[in-house]
């Protein structure tokens, strides 16, 4: 009976020790880190002119009808304004912003919102469609808080990460998760070595940063796998 008590006591100590060790790897809160990083993350909105052919008939075809596309080419071309949303992050105090190229591609006007309230016009100073990276310059003399960069090669599967961006136009949104996989290739571009995360990623997050727990950028949120988002690739 005495031996059983000793073994039971030892087992309880071991379970308690393992639980404490595991809990050290789980952040109690992301609040302090998010508060520090959010001023460096921006919301991007773009407008561009799109030319489409109109229906030449005075009546509308039923939605999804094959005749709708068939006869559109005979209609008169019509210009309309199209808008898009995305995210980005500041890499220099002089207002230099990095985002995805597909966020600003063919844009006529680019508006960048910083810290949730200040808006600035931006111009493209560099773009590479192959890597899907673009660099913007904010048209202002103000100083900003740039991000710090980490080493994505040191990021491990299972590490905690947070994504900050502008999903659905809801700026300043923070989500968290872990690195689910590395070295993903999904056929998006010539250069592919993506990190997969289960942090919630949705439309408008493109171009936003993926941070490690030290507050360093280790990736750019680029793509969503799945009909309803949530599986992030960057």
What are these regions (language model features)?
Residues 1, 14, 64-67:
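Intrinsically disordered, low-complexity regions
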């Amino acid at each position: 009976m005495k031996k059983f008590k000793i073994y039971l006591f030892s087992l309880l100590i071991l379970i308690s020790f393992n639980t404490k060790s595991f809990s050290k790897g789980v952040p109690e809160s992301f609040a302090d880190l998010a508060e520090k990083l959010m001023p460096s993350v921006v919301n991007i909105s773009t407008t561009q002119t799109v030319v489409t052919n109109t229906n030449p008939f005075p009546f509308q075809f039923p939605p999804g009808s094959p005749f709708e596309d068939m006869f559109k080419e005979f209609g008169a071309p019509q210009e309309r304004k199209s808008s898009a949303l995305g995210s980005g992050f500041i890499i220099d105090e002089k207002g230099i912003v990095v985002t995805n190229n597909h966020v600003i591609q063919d844009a006529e006007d680019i508006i960048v919102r910083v810290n949730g309230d200040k808006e600035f016009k931006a111009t493209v100073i560099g773009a590479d469609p192959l890597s899907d990276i673009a660099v913007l310059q904010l048209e202002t003399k103000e100083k900003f808080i740039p991000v710090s960069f980490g080493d994505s090669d040191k990021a491990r599967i299972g590490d905690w990460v947070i994504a900050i961006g502008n999903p659905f136009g809801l700026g300043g949104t923070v989500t968290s998760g872990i690195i689910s996989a590395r070295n993903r290739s999904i056929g998006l571009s010539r250069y592919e070595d993506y990190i997969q995360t289960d942090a919630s990623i949705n439309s408008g997050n493109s171009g936003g940063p993926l941070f490690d727990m030290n507050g360093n950028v280790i990736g750019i949120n680029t793509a969503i796998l799945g009909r309803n988002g949530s599986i992030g690739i960057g």
